[in-house]
Amino acid sequence: MKIPGFTYQHVQVADGVSLNAAIGGTGTPIVLLHGFPQTHLIWRHVAAELATDHTVICPDLRGYGASDKPAETDGTAYSKRTMAADIVALAAALGHPEFALVGHDRGALVAFRAGLDHPDKITQLVCLDVLPTLDMWDAMHGVNAAVAFHLYLMAQPPGLPEELIAAAPDAFFSYFLDLWIKDPAAIPAEIRAAYLTASREAVVSIVADYRASAGIDVEHDREDLAAGNKLRMPVAVVQQDWGSALGFDAAALWSAWAPDLRHSTTTAGHFMAEEAPAEITETIRSLLA
């Protein structure tokens, strides 16, 4: 499936790695990054509206959708640092050395890392429904870990997680599509089928992405924390109000990383770009204004 009116390219971003990207519109560039267990199609509504006056680039992340899925060899292939470098290379290859960056879920973690590693490239940053990796692990422990069991499952050494998920991939990925949504009609059957097909074919790389978040991504965040590195661009964060339910202050956690922060909560479910596209589009436009 494709976003209507957008053209598609496979763009090489690293040795042996190309990303599938939907591109539409003209104007100042915005890159939109999807999360788990989805593809660039999550942006079909938001991208169409933004493309009226922006160049909009919607890639499948490394390891997801129709993008390449390199084998993990040394623990870095799916680090957020590597995945962020992919996005900077993608934008540059398309003629955009600077751009606004929006990420949801896993894509927001890639966007967060891009903001820290490439502050001269990212003009504005929007993160949807995540906490920074270090804060995520601190917040989702103890009884809170029950709602995030997949983080712990996919953090295990290679072998068992992949085997368990591959044994019933549709059941595994459907569980999260059902659990995290408030308006099931926001993901029509054909879009859901596209997500399941793409995820079914990407079990190993999806697990590698999550495993990196329990290892090398934590190391990188700790290094930035120790060095006092922060996001230097304007940042907007939209989240469900998980903090009040699970006992953490999401706005305060984000403020520690983003001095120029606009934080808000939404009544939409996790898949807010599909459940509340007008709200998310307005958040993006307000930050860019």
Give the location of each predicted region.
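Flexible "cap/lid" subdomain of the alpha/beta-hydrolase fold that forms the substrate-access gate
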Residues: 2-10, 15, 19, 29, ...
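Conserved hydrophobic "DFG−1" position in protein kinase catalytic cores
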Residues: 21-23
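Short beta-strand element of the alpha/beta-hydrolase
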Residues: 28-34
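Conserved alpha/beta-hydrolase "nucleophile elbow" surrounding the catalytic nucleophile
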Residues: 34-36, 103-104
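Active-site helix-initiating loop/hinge in glycosyltransferases
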Residues: 35, 275-276
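The serine-hydrolase catalytic nucleophile loop
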Residues: 36-46
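A short, Lys/Arg-enriched amphipathic alpha-helix followed by its capping loop at the start of a domain
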Residues: 45-54, 93
